[in-house]
């Protein structure tokens, strides 16, 4: 039978209950049998396991011959432009550390084969206990832009060695607490393509292609899909994916509100002291008059400090907005 990627996901999770299953990785050589307890091994095993699962369930597929690029499986062997499935796995107790693709190969591939952008990523988040028992904690089915993000100095999260761009790396798409994440994953295919285009420009190895890359891609994509994509400029969208800047802006606004509130309260205290001063001056109470005047001067200094905080917070807001 033939299934779509979504149907494969549904069968794994809902019919076979993969989230309730347990397993082990066993290895034997000669008369020695062991249970593998190295957690890093699981990620590589899962693709082979899924292939065995597809065979066991009688699901048609054709394996990919190109191990350097997605997908791993063509779920429609008669049309290798549709129902493309890539399998990834990572230790759920850590962040995803798998590679998505070599950047240079990928930016060329999506021009020559725009349908590669429709690859479904079947991602397993696994755990292994000290006895080598493997369980699957989460399963996701995602598009590439739903698992990728920007980084500090690049529009795409990349593996960079000796200033040379290598692999596209994933972001964290499952974070419930955004305070622990500096950059959010892309919201759309269009934003993802914008980041790819800017990376082509920024990367010395691909910079010479940057001037025509977008136009070439858009022509190819329309020819393949019939759709005219509208790709935003990276400079127009990059800040919305920078959660650090968002948090800095929120903090600056909070600091501004606190400093403004403090400043208003100080002004009220100064007015109160002036009323008290007037009353004591009428009574000719020299001792209290002197003390109140000292209090007024102290509050004026506090007001100046609060005003400095207001100006500093406002300047930070202007910088970030």
Where do the model's predicted regions map?
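Beta-rich nucleic-acid/ligand-interaction surfaces
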Residues: 67-77
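Extended alpha-helical coiled-coil "stalk/arm" regions
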Residues: 260-296, 302
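Short acidic DE-rich linear segments
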Residues: 319-321
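Nucleic-acid endonuclease domains
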Residues: 1-69, 89-257, 263, 269, ...
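Conserved catalytic cores of phosphodiester-cleaving nucleases, focusing on short active-site segments
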Residues: 73-75, 83-91
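Conserved active-site beta-strand-loop modules that form the wall/rim of enzyme catalytic pockets
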Residues: 81-83, 120
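Short acidic-glycine loop/turn motifs at beta-strand connectors
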Residues: 77-79, 129-130
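A generic structural signal for ordered secondary structure
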Residues: 82, 293-296, 300, 307, ...
């Amino acid at each position: 039978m033939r299934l779509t990627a979504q149907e494969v996901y549904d069968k794994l999770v809902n019919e076979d209950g993969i989230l309730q299953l347990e397993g082990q990785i066993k290895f034997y050589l000669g008369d020695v049998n062991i249970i593998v307890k190295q957690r890093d091994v699981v990620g590589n095993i899962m693709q082979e396991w899924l292939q065995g699962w597809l065979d066991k369930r009688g699901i048609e597929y054709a394996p990919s011959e190109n191990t350097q690029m997605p997908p791993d499986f063509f779920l429609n062997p008669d049309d290798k432009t549709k129902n493309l499935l890539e399998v990834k796995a990572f230790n759920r107790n850590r962040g995803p550390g798998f590679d998505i693709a070599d950047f240079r190969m990928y930016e060329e591939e999506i021009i020559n084969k725009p349908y590669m952008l429709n690859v479904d990523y079947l991602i397993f988040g696994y755990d292994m206990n000290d006895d080598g028992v493997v369980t699957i904690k989460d399963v996701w089915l995602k598009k590439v832009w739903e698992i990728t993000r920007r980084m500090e100095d690049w529009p795409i999260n990349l593996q960079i060695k000796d200033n040379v761009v290598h692999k596209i790396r994933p972001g964290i798409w499952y974070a419930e607490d955004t305070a622990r994440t500096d950059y959010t994953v892309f919201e759309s295919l269009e934003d993802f393509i914008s980041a790819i285009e800017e990376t082509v420009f920024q990367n010395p190895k691909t910079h010479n292609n940057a001037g025509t890359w977008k136009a070439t891609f858009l022509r190819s994509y329309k020819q393949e899909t019939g759709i005219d994509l509208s790709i935003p400029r990276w400079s127009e969208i990059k800040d919305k994916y920078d959660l650090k800047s968002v948090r800095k802006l929120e903090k600056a606004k909070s600091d501004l509100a606190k400093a403004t509130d403090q400043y208003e309260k100080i002004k009220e205290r100064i007015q109160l002291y002036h009323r008290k001063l007037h009353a004591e001056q009428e009574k000719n109470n020299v001792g209290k008059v002197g003390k109140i005047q000292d209090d007024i001067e102290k509050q004026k200094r506090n007001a100046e400090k609060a005003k400095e905080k207001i100006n500093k917070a406002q300047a930070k807001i202007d910088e970030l907005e």
